[in-house]
Regions:
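Alpha-helical transmembrane segments of integral membrane proteins
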Residues: 4-298
Length: 298
């Protein structure tokens, strides 16, 4: 899309927003703005990281220590993007209508699903994931769709899809304002422990899944691991960033508590990320050592 088209679209959407704001006393358009921000903030953060990753594309693999430092740095940058977007959402919804729940934030489940979909699109435009090429035009997109829908599928792919589908069901089902997938007992115990030991209990999906995966994604790219591994880690990393933004959509929670909750999750997530990188490095070293021994014995 050209810059001229982007400007026309921007002014058109802005004008339409003003009209809707006047006609609905601001409630509907505020909900739309908040939902759009909750979706675009994590996507913008991930696109910014992708652009940073591309600066090292074509370069030689970096050392493990430098890659770990960059992984930690980029996690903090993404978290800052998420915090800015989250506080913007809190400012949009910070009025009596939403505090008294005469109006509600709508689309909580979309804030978890759409960022992942949009990041997939952004990734395909920037990295040669599909058959060693990127997708940057309508023709390439059509070719991708045709090839994807007509490719040969092995039986194990169905098991992988089933596992991913179960993970998505749990992930989405436990979001929103209504009860969905029940929380297991061991997780309730973990939550109570975190509530008793930390200023604000961080979200498990942030410090257990999202943040460590995002750090490992940066590490994987800097060390020139296979693109498919980097892609999967990037998608897992979106979960943590999107969760940080969604925290600010809970209007009953003071903004300061949301900030501290994100900070605590970032702190533990960064620690887990470093430990995960060390563990993966150790496993790779052990694997290489055993392979070298087998070669020597032969």
């Amino acid at each position: 899309m050209s810059k001229h088209t982007q400007l026309v679209a921007f002014f058109g959407i802005s004008l339409a927003s003003i009209v809707v704001f006047i006609l609905t006393s601001g409630t509907l358009i505020t909900q739309i703005w908040a939902l759009s921000s909750a979706i675009m903030a994590p996507v913008g953060a991930m696109i910014r990281l992708m652009e940073e990753w591309r600066r090292y594309d074509g370069a030689r693999p970096l050392g493990a220590i430098k890659s770990t430092i960059l992984a930690l740095l980029y996690l903090v940058i993404a978290a800052l993007f998420a915090a800015i977007g989250g506080m913007y959402i809190a400012s949009l919804l910070g009025n009596t209508k939403f505090f008294m729940e005469f109006a509600l934030f709508r689309g909580v489940k979309l804030t978890f699903v759409l960022p992942i979909i949009l990041v997939i699109i952004a990734y395909l435009q920037r990295f040669p994931l599909w058959n060693g090429r990127m997708i940057n035009s309508k023709e390439e997109a059509k070719t991708f769709v045709v090839e994807f829908l007509t490719m040969d599928v092995k039986l194990y792919v169905f098991f992988i899809i089933a596992a991913l589908g179960g993970a998505v069901w749990v992930f989405v089902g436990r979001s929103g304002h209504t009860a969905g997938v029940p929380v297991p007992g061991f997780e309730l115990m973990l939550r109570r422990f975190l509530e008793n030991t930390m200023y604000a209990r961080p979200r498990e999906k942030e410090f257990i899944i999202g943040h460590p995966a995002l750090m490992l994604a940066t590490f994987a790219f800097m060390r020139k691991w296979p693109t498919v591994i980097h892609f999967l880690l990037t998608l897992a990393g979106v979960i943590g960033i999107a969760s940080m933004v969604e925290t600010f959509c809970h209007l009953r929670t003071p903004v300061f508590m949301s900030i501290m909750r994100g900070y605590d999750g970032l702190l533990i997530g960064a620690l887990f990320g470093v430990l995960l990188i060390i563990a993966v490095r150790f496993m790779m070293y052990v694997t290489q050592w055993f392979q070298a021994r087998e070669v020597d014995h032969e």
